[in-house]
Amino acid sequence: MSQSNPVRIFVTHAWQNSDDYLRVFEYLESQRNFFYRNYGTPDRRPQGDREALRENLRQQITPAEAIIALSSLYQAHQDLLTFQLRYAQASHKPVILLKPFGAPQEVPKALLDLADEVVEWDERALVDAIRRQARHEETTRWDTIEFKLD
């Protein structure tokens, strides 16, 4: 993965920039040497009926290599989120589910069943999940801890 070959992602949305939606990009931007292209366009809601909205979502999801699902959308936009994840699954796109931010809420089983991987809100965990699911890259890391023996 490089600037010339960024990972293509789609982050689930309900046609608005929620705090969680924006937080995903803060996390991705904080990681060095991680390049991505977002195919989601929550700020451009198409005109038309329910099918027009779904077709627009299909067009956003199709070029993506990985889907990042915000479980926080489920309660208010269950049908829309479920549609996005089912379409991703039918298109053989890996789904990375982010648990609810900051609250010890249970993730609904319906979402867990549609996810390939579930991660906490952690920059490293999110980027590693994207690398594993989208590009099948090895993401094993070792932290070096230095200490002095007295």
Can you name each region flagged by the protein language model?
Residues L126-I145:
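A charged, well-structured terminal subsegment
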Residues R50-R54, T82, E123:
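Structural motif corresponding to alpha-helix initiation and N-cap regions
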Residues S18-Y21, H77, A103-P108:
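Short catalytic/ligand-binding loop motif for oxyanion handling, primarily in non-cytosolic enzymes
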Residues M1-P63, D143-D150:
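Conserved N-terminal substructure of TIR/SEFIR domains
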Residues Y36, V95-L97, V118-E120:
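Conserved beta-strand scaffold positions in the cores of enzyme catalytic domains, especially
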Residues Q60-A103:
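Conserved beta-strand-loop-alpha-helix hinge of the TIR/SEFIR fold
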Residues D113-A129:
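Short, glycine-/small-residue-rich phosphate/pyrophosphate-handling segment
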Residues G102-V118:
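Glycine-rich, charge-decorated loop segments at or immediately adjacent to ligand/cofactor-binding or catalytic sites
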